[in-house]
Amino acid sequence: THFAVALKYTAGQASAPEVIAMGRGQIALQIIERAKNAKITTLRIPILARALYYTSDIGGEIAEGLYNAVAVILAYVFRIESGESIEMPELTLPQEFRFDENGNIDEGRF
């Protein structure tokens, strides 16, 4: 199952990134397609997408426990959009944010 979460963050204007769209399955694929058509950077990070999906609301800020992971990814996006060629950083999420595709805490691989 695909998950997609679109975030918006304007430094200095918001205290945390805001969820502007999210979905799973066919809706997730539509979100990804629209982002690509709008030339918005998309990344496939299933563990983070599931964490955001299961702990966020559209129009709301992300959960405080995900601030670090999202900050790492936003910094990465800003760098690649400025032309740097760097590898995507590895993410570590707190255990309570590691969900499987059904919304259960995933005690496995992470």
Residues covered by each model-derived region:
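Divalent-cation
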Residues: 1-110
